[in-house]
A protein has these predicted regions:
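Conserved N-terminal phosphate-binding loop of PLP-dependent enzymes in the Aspartate aminotransferase
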Residues: 1-456
Length: 456
């Protein structure tokens, strides 16, 4: 997608060679290890880095799996067990190991979310193109799915959009427009009219599940913190998600952060929980955890959740595993990638004092892009820059081919491989990609969109 020159190119090449060497050593040294009742050095080192980094001050346990969707399945099992114990649902140990189903456990989630393609992960997301009968005939949607407020840049202004389900008559213009993206994350908003509005809305939605005799329970909150990925690259108002977490804490509903997409510097910080200003009970990581080199995932959780599975009976344990759980090559890649991203000597984008990435996308160019008449919104955060094109009817949405001529031009004439999500296109650089490269790519995208004339 791009070429880097000089010393930085040599440094990145050196790091990649070192990563490949470590993976090769792990393959030769360990081969395949059945992880139950075993451990090896790469898995131990990776767990230490996870708990000392993204899990610092809240997590104490790591459960490995092979991909993000499976990490979500494990997280759901963890949250449901914790909820069931806290509510006294599993008091009778004899019944707890049978297949009796006298209650229904559901999730609280957001419309537009995406948590993976395995069956349980799909049940935890609202109806979408991914869950249609063509894709998943078993889908029923076991959750309460809320329509979230979103934040975006349009005409150079950072704005808040509220769904119809949330009444906005009490919000002033100052609550719906922000001088900068940093103001969106400001904790002073916790005492705003918007926070009260969100709290009332969420409480009303949860009220039908508050009756103690109800057989249906909201047993977990699962969200993609800040950015919804495959659902369209929407930025959810962080205040809404923060209030959502607070309301669930008050009701002893375990909180899951799906950071498969957002984790490990994707949004400019190591964990999106830093942007939200609140912590989960369970969080899932994959993708950039290994630098994108090989599949590996981790479900990270608290000691309290771990305790929910302790027992003298093996049947009470978390019986979820794979042949390639904590495979040594993946753990070695993760160790190297995590260290690489956190070290300013190998990641020149890292502001080590603040433990944040420097701004990668040129703000002036982003604002100019958002002001084009054929652009509906722009989301620019960390390594991500997403653009939604103005489109109506069948030209909008995931199934749309509206942007295909634009995509073809970018690929064939500009050497930029842009993946579309319907009428949404996006750029994602690496955490170590230089700002100059990002500006070069975004300038080409701006030029193409400014001359874009879709062919139907």
């Amino acid at each position: 997608m791009h070429v880097q020159v000089g010393g930085l190119k040599d440094l990145i090449l050196s790091c990649r060679i070192e990563l490949a060497r470590d993976m090769g050593y792990a393959a030769a040294r360990y081969g395949h290890v059945m992880f139950p009742e075993n451990a090896h050095e790469p898995a131990l080192r990776c767990a230490e880095l996870l708990l000392g980094g993204i899990g610092k001050d809240w997590a104490s346990r790591v459960y490995y799996s092979d991909n993000g969707s499976t990490a979500i399945e494990i997280a759901l099992k963890m949250a449901f067990r914790k909820f069931s114990l806290d509510r006294g649902i599993l008091l009778d140990s004899d019944k707890s190991i049978t297949n009796e189903r006298n209650i229904q456990l559901k999730v609280l989630a957001l419309k537009g979310s995406y948590h993976g393609d395995t069956l349980g992960a799909m049940e935890a997301q609202a109806p979408s193109a991914y869950t249609s009968f063509l894709q998943q005939p078993w889908y029923s949607g076991r959750g309460l799915f809320l329509d979230p407020p979103t934040v975006f840049i349009r005409n150079g202004t950072c704005a808040l959009s509220l769904p119809q389900s949330i009444q906005n008559c009490h919000l002033s213009p100052g609550d719906k427009c922000f001088p900068s993206l940093a103001d969106v994350f400001c904790k002073s908003r916790d005492s705003s009219a918007a926070a009260d509005l969100y709290s009332t809305y969420i409480s009303q939605q949860l009220s039908e599940y508050s009756v103690s005799s109800n057989i249906e329970h909201i047993a977990a909150l699962i969200i993609e913190p800040v950015i919804q990925g495959a659902g369209g690259m929407h930025m959810i108002d962080p205040l809404f998600q923060r209030v959502l977490v607070h309301e669930c804490r008050d009701r002893k509903i375990p909180v899951i952060f799906d950071e498969v997409f957002t984790g490990f510097w994707r949004l400019g910080v190591e964990s999106a929980s830093e942007l939200l200003g609140c912590l989960p009970d369970v969080a899932c990581y994959a993708k950039l955890m290994t630098g994108g080199i090989v599949p590996l995932a981790a479900t990270v959780t608290t000691e309290a959740v771990f305790e929910a599975f302790k027992s003298d009976s093996k049947l009470t344990a978390l019986l979820h595993g794979h042949s390639y759980t904590a495979h040594a090559m993946g753990c070695s890649a993760a160790v190297k990638a995590i260290q690489w991203f956190r070290d300013p000597s190998t990641n020149s984008n890292l502001d080590f004092d603040r433990m944040k990435l420097k701004e990668l996308w040129d703000g002036t160019l982003v604002n100019q892009l958002s002001s084009l008449p054929n652009v509906k919104r722009v989301v620019s955060l960390g390594t991500l820059c997403a653009i939604e094109l103005q489109a109506e009817g069948s030209d909008a949405g995931y199934a749309s081919l509206y942007a295909r001529s634009l995509i073809q031009q970018l690929r064939e004439e500009d050497d930029i491989y842009v993946r579309p999500l319907g009428n949404v296109i996006y750029l994602m650089c690496g955490p170590c990609t230089t700002r100059d490269v990002c500006t070069e790519q975004l300038s080409k995208v701006y030029h193409r969109i400014s001359h874009f004339n879709p062919i139907h």
